[in-house]
């Protein structure tokens, strides 16, 4: 093929590809969105209390660390999220108990009646540490996480949470510790055998609030919390 014919062929191919993409925008692959911080150095504008606007009494932000010591109102995001990847670092006090809720709604009086929970716990000293179903990184009361992955109290742990369509992954300190499918037969049977059975829309929302549990005793600190939306 001579050079003129080669240029003409390449031009035709590129024009055809552009026209195809324009006619079928859904065919163009879209990746994850950009990472976005959910915490500033001295404020938490992306969060509010479950019961009240703004940051409830007992929660504090300093040096990019969100913390509480003792029972306080739960926190929820101002914005709802459907498919996302969430990363954060957390440390908990001795016998501390907290959690990260996802796809929560305001249908019920507490977020935990609608939202699955990634458990944050001092496994060695909190009562919930006696069962893997309620230990650190478990999908609370539904899917257990293995022992020996969480670090002791007052040490920083790294969490990654992936929620896409019905697929959920819990990661702890670089290790995938829980994976499950929302609305699957297995998931439904576990919910039916749990305390969440009384709440028919538990875990069914396709998008909702992210929450941080504050109503249990003990100290909790969160830093480097960021999120990106997934296609």
Give short role names for the model-derived ranges.
Residues 1-9:
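Bacterial N-terminal signal peptides that target proteins for export
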Residues 8-18:
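Bacterial N-terminal signal peptides
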Residues 21-231:
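Carbohydrate-interacting regions of secretory-pathway proteins
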């Amino acid at each position: 093929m001579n050079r003129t014919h080669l240029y003409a062929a390449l031009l035709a191919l590129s024009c055809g590809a552009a026209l195809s993409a324009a006619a079928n925008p859904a065919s163009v692959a879209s990746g994850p969105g950009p990472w976005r911080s959910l915490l500033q150095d001295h404020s938490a504008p992306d969060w509010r209390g479950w019961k009240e606007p703004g940051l409830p009494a007992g929660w504090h932000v300093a040096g990019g660390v969100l913390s509480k010591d003792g029972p306080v109102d739960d926190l929820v995001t101002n914005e709802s999220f459907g498919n996302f990847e969430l990363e954060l670092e957390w440390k908990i006090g001795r016998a501390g108990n907290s959690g990260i809720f996802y796809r929560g709604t305001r249908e019920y009086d507490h977020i935990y009646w609608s939202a699955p929970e990634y458990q944050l716990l001092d496994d060695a000293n909190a009562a919930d540490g006696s069962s893997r179903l309620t230990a650190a990184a478990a999908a609370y009361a539904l899917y257990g996480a293995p022992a020996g992955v969480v670090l002791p109290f007052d040490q920083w742990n790294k969490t990654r949470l992936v929620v896409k369509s019905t697929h959920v992954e819990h990661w702890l300190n670089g290790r995938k510790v829980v994976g499950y499918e929302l609305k699957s037969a297995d998931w439904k049977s576990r919910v039916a055998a749990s305390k969440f059975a009384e709440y028919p829309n538990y875990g069914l929302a396709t998008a909702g609030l992210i929450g941080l549990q504050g109503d249990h005793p003990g100290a909790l600190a969160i830093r480097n919390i960021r999120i990106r939306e997934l296609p």
